[in-house]
Amino acid sequence: MSVAWIGSQPVSLMDAIQNVAKLLVSSRCPVFTIDADVHGTRSAIALAERVGGAFDHIHGDTLAREVALFADQGAMITTPGETRRRSSLVVLVGDIPVAHHELLLHLAGSNPDLGDRNKRVWFHVEGALEPPSDAGRLHRKLRPVAIGGEGLGLSGVLAALRADLLGRNQTGSLANVDRLKSALGKSRFPVFVFSGAMNSPDLAMLQGLVADLNKQGRASSLFLPTDDDAWGTALTSLWMTGFPPRTGFSDSLPSYDPVRWDTQRMVRDKEADLHVWVSARGTMPPKGRIGLVSLSRTEKRTEGAAVTISVGRAGVDHDGVAFSSRIGTFHSLTASAPSELPSIASVLQQLALVFPGRMGLPC
């Protein structure tokens, strides 16, 4: 089976790698769009630095919004383990992605055993204007008490709830707010669960509410990212460069700008002249009018790509390391169906070795 193509022609892996090296050497503004495990991400970032490019995640817009919470607002964050062991009051805020429902169901099947040992109770702060979610099974199991107000979106409900908890006068009332107040009075460590699907004003209001509660007791929030792999890329980027994705190396030093280094925008606006698409999940790149190199988990060439290299996925084709929101940190992955597909990290390491100077990547 072919794993590399130049245009539409199958070639050896080394021929494809050498062709990619030529394209990168001749490029004046290459950009990397990444979706990989930790090893693949580290190699892609190191290569972007080597060639003076910029990098972003495939889900860059969503990830940038999630990063903004921490960069612009700050947040009080706990882990799933601390929530499971210490919190008898869990408040869901907004819609929680289906990918995290199993984690919440696992929490529902246990009770805290440290500090706060009351039976765990659930509430759900939701807006009347939210689109229907896929939370039917989750709600049947958790049976959360709904907190909301007629005609209020999530922003309005959070604002009204925060004002109510501070004892401020307001027009209208929220359903079941007295029950939540009673539960807050009994709980020693309430936790508010939210995801990156919320918008920035909602996130800021939620963190303000948590900060208010911490003036008289202890409370925190549990962040469940929209995409675990994307959040892992953000954390990997932070420890390598000091910045999240949407970072560029145009003057050799890392520079973060969520607008300037939005790689897919740069491709659309032809600010870049070469797009290196790296996808272990096999996501196809959007069509563009600049040169394209595709490192993707695919069985055929990527349409429009000057070079296509088929790569494996960590946890399926080869071992790797990835972020898991279930444990709140990175964990190792064991290949479930080992194959001969090369890993992203190994391809990029070989690519670095055929560059002028033949220096391997420092990771």
Task: Describe each region flagged by the PLM.
Residues 67-218, 248-363:
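Non-catalytic alpha/beta scaffold blocks inside enzyme catalytic domains
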Residues 10-14, 19, 26-44, 95-99, ...:
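Gly/Ser/Thr-rich loops at beta-strand to alpha-helix junctions
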Residues 23-27, 186-187:
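DNA replication sliding-clamp ring fold and its partner-interaction surfaces
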Residues 19-23, 39-51, 111, 204-212:
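Histidine-anchored nucleotide/phosphate-binding helix
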Residues 8-11, 168:
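Short, surface-exposed alpha-helical recognition segments that flank or form part
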Residues 29-85, 214-253:
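Anionic-ligand anchoring segments at beta-strand to alpha-helix junctions in alpha/beta enzyme folds, i.e.
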Residues 1-7:
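N-terminal juxtadomain amphipathic helix
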